[in-house]
Curated annotation (Swiss-Prot):
The gene is rplW. It comes from Prochlorococcus marinus (strain MIT 9303). Belongs to the universal ribosomal protein uL23 family. PROSITE patterns: RIBOSOMAL_L23 (PS00050). This is Large ribosomal subunit protein uL23. Gene3D superfamilies: 3.30.70.330. GO terms for molecular function: rRNA binding; structural constituent of ribosome. Pfam families: Ribosomal_L23. It comes from the Bacteria. Keywords: Ribonucleoprotein, Ribosomal protein, RNA-binding, rRNA-binding. Part of the 50S ribosomal subunit. Contacts protein L29, and trigger factor when it is bound to the ribosome. Disulfide bonds: none annotated.
Length: 100
């Protein structure tokens, strides 16, 4: 674990990403999260294992380019986003949707 997030692992994971592709990846026990853009793979692994009490087998991260946003004549950039696809050990699950 890097020193940037030492003791603040809850700040690493921002939210789960619920898309069609991410939902289909749940069948392979892969979960997609939006994470802090400064987080490294050891930070993400430690945060997921501690917050959800599961065992992480692998992590894939991607840093897509920032998108431009225009409002009237003003242009700006959207916030930096980093996505992490976390693969869990067999038998471990994360409850993303509440039971009805």
């Amino acid at each position: 674990m890097t020193e940037r997030f030492n003791g603040r692992l809850a700040d690493v994971i921002r939210r789960p990403l619920i898309t069609e592709k991410a939902t289909s990846a749940l069948e392979q026990n892969q979960y997609t999260f939006e994470v802090d853009h400064r987080a490294a793979k050891p930070d993400i692994k430690a945060a997921v294992e501690q917050l959800f009490d599961v065992r992480v087998v692998g992590i894939s991260t991607m840093n897509p380019p920032r998108r431009s946003r225009r409002v009237g004549r003003f242009t700006g950039k959207r916030a930096q986003v980093k996505k992490a696809i976390v693969r869990l050990a067999e038998g471990n699950t994360i409850q993303l949707f509440p039971e009805s």
